Amino acid sequence: MLFRSKVLGLFDDNYTQKKFNSLQDVFHELNKYPKLKWIIMRNFEGMPHNITVDEHLDIDLLVNDYFLIKTILDGFSATNNRYDDGKNRILNYVIINNKKVLFDFRFVGDNYYDQKLQEKMLNSRVLHKNGFYIPNPEIHLYTLIYHAIIHKPKISPTYVKIFKEYGLEDSIINKKDLKSKLNDWFQKNGYSYCRPEPSVGYHLH
């Protein structure tokens, strides 16, 4: 693999970093590989056209194969304690429009979510009209609830807006009531809470 060769210092001196002109080009590239299952987990509203591609953009993917997507996009690690070296960070840069754009390459079995839930997320994914994959509506809602109350210390106004769009009442958009709703859904489907790698928050109360 190209990135492994680069790490080991074995790549050709003439090797050129893969670059993409747009986020749409990235999605098109990913869709060329039938062995890769991938979704954008959240914050995909407005993609790929109505977002600013710069160093502040952070795209959260879930994939079935970390090393495959890293190779396809020629991603290079944005941190030192990287998964590639047996540690835990999966944050990578991908070059888009000559800018380094951050991607989280979350993968099945990494404890970001329960593995059974991760597999369901990929196996029930939906192709968005703009050419990228997203969770089905039910899974999007509940994984966003999980992210908002378990991974994060407080609920983002962005997520409050999305919860309302899904029909949730103001009165239950709080950690206690959302946790109760999530517990019921987890119990119904046989999912469990998972402690993720240390860079991710874990606020299970």
Where are the model-predicted features located?
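Conserved NTP-donor binding/palm subdomain of two-metal-ion nucleotidyltransferases/polymerases, i.e.
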Residues: 3-57, 61-205
